[in-house]
Regions:
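Active-site loop of short-chain dehydrogenase/reductase
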Residues: 1-4, 16, 54-55, 87, ...
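Conserved Rossmann-fold NAD(P)-dependent oxidoreductase catalytic core, especially the SDR/UDP-sugar
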Residues: 1-32
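Flexible, glycine-rich beta-alpha linker
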Residues: 13-14, 29-33, 57-74
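Active-site Tyr-X1-5-Lys
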Residues: 15-17, 31-57, 82-83
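Short-chain dehydrogenase/reductase
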Residues: 30-42, 69-76, 103-104, 134
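Structural element of the ATP-grasp superfamily
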Residues: 45, 78, 177-178
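C-terminal substrate-binding subdomain of Rossmann-fold SDR/epimerase-dehydratase oxidoreductases
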Residues: 82-212
Length: 212
């Protein structure tokens, strides 16, 4: 085995206060069972490295999107909702005045980052793979609706009451990878145009599993 890359998640760090961007070695504070299982799996990887000298690195990646994404995910769900004139529910704070925010990253950028790490890594290290800009989900929905030339019918809902353990804001620092020579190349708005066009041209990928 030359290298084992474990894909973890930004969620292991828990919610990020405004202005905070978690670095790779910051303390974990999982906000839900899914995040806890990912953090536990990271520790299992570390134990295999320490015990069996397995060559392991770990990545934290957040909110990957692209063609063929599952229709339940936010971006394809917005596309299908705008297309059909349906209401989209957007997770927000308790007052329903601020939408949750993320650093969305194109799947092609993630693949590029992985290839970069194959040639540029240090065994036992962790790496954040982060999108170029932070965007809240209402802004993202409005961008998609504008691309489609249709209105966005939406309702803000309290994120925790609708999905316990869901964090309003996730944020990672991409400075480590940047210092190594890697940065995402895809512009969010330009890539969204491509995803919208592809999804509308391949509507089977927007179809819910319950649909015939």
């Amino acid at each position: 085995l030359d290298l084992f890359l474990y894909f973890s998640t930004d969620e292991v760090f828990g919610p990020a206060p405004e202005g905070v961007f978690y670095e790779e070695d910051d303390r974990y504070k999982s906000g839900n069972p899914y995040a806890a299982t990912k953090a536990g799996a990271e520790e299992l990887c570390v134990s295999y490295q320490n015990t069996y000298r397995m060559p392991i690195i770990i990545s934290h990646t957040m909110n990957i999107f692209g063609n063929r994404q599952h229709p339940e995910k936010f971006i394809p769900l917005v596309i299908s909702s705008v297309r059909d004139g349906k209401k989209i529910f957007i997770h927000s704070n308790e007052e329903c005045s601020k939408a949750g925010s993320r650093h969305y990253i194109d799947a092609k950028d993630v693949a590029d980052a992985v290839l970069f790490l194959f040639d540029n890594h240090k065994i036992g290290e962790k790496y954040n793979i982060v999108g170029r800009e932070e965007t809240d989900n209402l802004e993202l929905g409005l961008i998609i609706a504008d691309i489609m030339g249709k209105p966005l019918n939406y309702e803000m809902i309290d994120f925790h009451s609708s999905r316990p353990g869901h964090d309003l804001r996730y944020a990672l620092s991409g400075e480590k990878m940047k210092a190594m020579g890697w940065e995402p190349r895809k512009d969010l708005k330009d890539r969204l145009k491509g995803v919208v066009k592809w999804s509308l041209g391949n509507p089977v990928w927007l179809r819910d599993e319950d649909e015939n």
